Design a protein with these regions (language model features):
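Signature of N-terminal electron-transfer/Fe-S-associated modules in redox systems
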Residues: 1-125
C-alpha cells in the first residue's frame, strides 16, 4: 500500500525543515507558497504554533510582503510598473486599459484563473 502526502503533511515537513534555523518565518512562508501557490489558511495555525507567534503577527508579516498571496494567482501574472518614471510615459493608461479589459482591480484574478494583474514598483526596464 502506498501513502500519499496530505497538504498538512507537506506543511509540517516545510516547518520542520526550517524551524530550528535563526529567523525561520520567511523561509517557511516562501516554501509554503512555492508548494501551494499561496499561503493557505490551513498553514497559518501550524506555522504560528511552531514559531510561538500569534496568528495576527503571522498575518501582519504575510500582508506586509507583497509577494505573499492569500489566494492562488492566475496561470499568468501580469505585473505593471507603478513607479513615477513609468507613469510619466503612460503606465497609468496601460494599467487602466488592462484592468478595464479584464474587469479586475489590482491583485485580481480572472474568473477562469488565467490572469492575475499586480502592481510593481520599478522593474528597471524603462
Amino acid at each position: 500500500m502506498t501513502t500519499t502526502a496530505t497538504p498538512t503533511d507537506e506543511i509540517d515537513a516545510i516547518i520542520a525543515r526550517h524551524v530550528a534555523r535563526e529567523g525561520p518565518l520567511l523561509p517557511i512562508l516562501h516554501d509554503v507558497q512555492a508548494a501551494f501557490g499561496h499561503i493557505p489558511d490551513d498553514a497559518r495555525a501550524p506555522i504560528a504554533a511552531a514559531l510561538n507567534i500569534t496568528r495576527a503577527e503571522l498575518h501582519g508579516v504575510i500582508s506586509f510582503y507583497h509577494d505573499f498571496r492569500d489566494t492562488p494567482a492566475g496561470r499568468h501574472v501580469v505585473r505593471i510598473c507603478r513607479a513615477e518614471a513609468c507613469q510619466a510615459v503612460g503606465a497609468n493608461a496601460l494599467s487602466e486599459a488592462v484592468l478595464g479589459k479584464l474587469g479586475l482591480d489590482w491583485h485580481g484574478t480572472t474568473p477562469d484563473g488565467r490572469v492575475t494583474v499586480e502592481p510593481v514598483y520599478c522593474l528597471g526596464l524603462c
